[in-house]
Amino acid sequence: VIEEYDLSFLNLNTTKSKLLEIETASHGLVSKGFSTYNHGMPVLMYPELTGLRNIIKQYVKLYCIKYNIPPLKFINSWFNISQAGNKLKAHKHEESVISGAFYISGSTSLIFPETSVKPYSGLLVLFSSDLVHYTEEETEERIIISFNTDYL
């Protein structure tokens, strides 16, 4: 199940500034861009992102209540900066229950088997981790925070 939440009321300038300070590396799913996936501290654990982490936690909790899922915890989080021309390869998130994507900036749709989501700044997308998803070629820079969850 895929749910979209509009968090565009958040001021993301501080979040974006902090993300751009964090050291990144290449990522096998990101052909043109950078990531913190498996590189350094989980991005949602940075003290500067505590407010955002707490807001996302509340939406994960609402999702769990709606779909009768036991309480969850974050098990990892990272961000990707994808440049124009990047394609996110089809994949799913193993060993996770619910995954999420929070868009700082976005361009190309996030595509699932039966639907797609058009991203915008401040969009939070929560989905079952076993759903395969990908993007077509990005038309502009995309900055996204992604995360996985597991049972408490």
Set out the residue ranges of the language-model regions:
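Catalytic core of non-heme Fe(II) oxygenases with the double-stranded beta-helix
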Residues: 71-137, 141-152
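Non-heme Fe(II)/2-oxoglutarate
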Residues: 1-69
